[in-house]
Amino acid sequence: MQCECKFEQRRKSRRIEHEFSLSPSRPARLSLPRSCHDTAIPEPHTCVDCRSLAVRICSPEVLVLHVQSFDLGPAGLPIRRLSAADLAACVELAADRGWPPEQNKWRLLFAVSEAYGIDDPAGGLAAMAVLTRYGRQLAAVGTMVVASRFGRRGLGRRLMGHLLEQAGPAVVYLAANSSSYGRPLYQSLGFRSIDTVTRHAGRFAPRPHAALPGSLRSASMSDREPMAALDRKVFGADRGRVLTELFGLAERVLVAEDGRGALAGFAAAWRNESDLVIGPLVAADLAVARTLITAVAAEENGSVRVDIRGGHLELANWAAARGLVPCGSATLMVHGGNLPGDRDKLFAPVSGATG
């Protein structure tokens, strides 16, 4: 099928105006050939040749009229649920904003979260975000990305409003990048800042430290139930699905036991592009957290990353002194209530998108 740009130029002398609507709230007026008048109602579609938004008149063989030059506005672009088939488009959208590919992170998100997006009429995605549910009482919003060409047009507000509606009565939280334009938007929607999360990364340089009473070992299948129980207490909700997917992805999962053999903490280490990410990191105290980080990071020759909450300043200083230097921060924001659980024992999240 031929793109209509040339065809329209030949038929200018035989045109009349015809109204159609891409959405109930966005009428548009186009000039159409007289031969097509009264024969069909214009129907929006995507051109198979150039992927621009178009209107098909009469039949595919008669006319395809391009409307790419019309400003449809954010209200004319519907929000849809994304699937694994959209993963490549999400990675491409993130790259538009300078984000690294992070294939493992995206696969994890699509496995445990609900992804929503707005299509770019010219192809690809104009915006997307994910919602991760932890039961009915808690949910996380992450990877809110709007293509640079669609910036400042309200797509982010529409997406966030949609995610809050989907979350229902749940407390919703997110980590807003320090360089993000999103924080004023989130504040206007009722989010409030409660903490910071700082990304520490680099080559880990271990130092001698006092031995931890108890033991440290690789996790086994028999540890899953005790780990899940500890995590529910600390996190304040059941994130068993996230942990199950993550442990399948992780290179190492370690558990720490106290002197009586009780579970004192655990950590997972998973590969995200060039970094070995440590998270989640759940520990009874600072000493256990340090021991778990050391055990994981000391065996890695490349870059190690751990995201540390602002409330754990002593751990952050300890990590920086061993080569894991601060290299970016985010503001932890919450909507609809307070975060549940014993958060002082949650030293590092799985990721900023999931918590």
Model region roles, listed by residue range:
Residues 1-12, 31-41:
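Polybasic, low-complexity intrinsically disordered segments
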Residues 3-5, 36, 47-50, 58:
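Cysteine-centered motifs
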Residues 199-225, 230-231:
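Surface-exposed beta-loop interaction hotspot
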Residues 171-177, 192-206, 326-338:
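Conserved catalytic-core motifs of GNAT/GCN5-like acyltransferases
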Residues 59-76, 83-88, 108, 119-121, ...:
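Intrinsically disordered, low-complexity, positively biased terminal segments
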Residues 141, 173-178, 306:
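Conserved hydrophobic beta-strand within the GNAT/NAT acetyltransferase core sheet
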Residues 186-187, 191, 319:
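Conserved active-site tyrosine of GNAT-family acetyltransferases
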